[in-house]
């Protein structure tokens, strides 16, 4: 039984991280409401929750600027427009590995191809 590897695009990974931060911040602040009898603990929960939500906003702004600089391409598998960050990425829709580097065509997909160490080789 062969294992099918599933890749996801970098933009979607970062957006998912920011969304998790929003929900984690809200849940943390809800924990502050549950501990309202212990005032100092409630304040800590609210501050941590607020910082998480603010950090998620910063991540969303950052990924928005990255998304504007990403190269738009048409996926050869699903023929939908997607964006690529780096030398290798995955389609946002069908998870198909993509590359714009002719040297990497036909080679097994690996995210290490985006690292600076690999580019120097």
From Swiss-Prot:
Keyword Membrane: yes
Keyword Transmembrane listed: yes
InterPro entries given in the database record: UPF0295
Ranges annotated as spanning the membrane: 14-34, 43-63
Pfam families linked: DUF2614
UniProt keyword annotations, A-Z: Cell membrane, Membrane, Transmembrane, Transmembrane helix
Subcellular localization, as worded in the UniProt entry: Cell membrane
Annotated membrane topology: Multi-pass membrane protein
GO cellular component: plasma membrane
Similarity comment text for this entry: Belongs to the UPF0295 family.
Protein name listed in UniProt: UPF0295 protein OB0906
Species whose genome carries this gene: Oceanobacillus iheyensis (strain DSM 14371 / CIP 107618 / JCM 11309 / KCTC 3954 / HTE831)
């Amino acid at each position: 039984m062969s294992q099918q590897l599933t890749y996801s695009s970098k933009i979607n990974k970062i957006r998912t991280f920011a969304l998790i931060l929003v929900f984690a911040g809200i849940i943390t602040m809800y924990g502050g409401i549950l501990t309202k009898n212990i005032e100092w603990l409630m304040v800590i929960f609210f501050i941590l929750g607020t910082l998480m939500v603010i950090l998620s906003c910063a991540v969303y702004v950052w990924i928005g600027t990255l998304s504007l600089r990403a190269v738009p391409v048409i996926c050869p598998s699903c023929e939908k427009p997607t964006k690529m960050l780096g030398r290798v990425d995955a389609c946002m829709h069908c998870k198909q590995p993509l590359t714009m580097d002719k040297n990497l065509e036909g080679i097994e997909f690996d995210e290490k191809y985006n690292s600076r160490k690999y580019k120097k080789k």
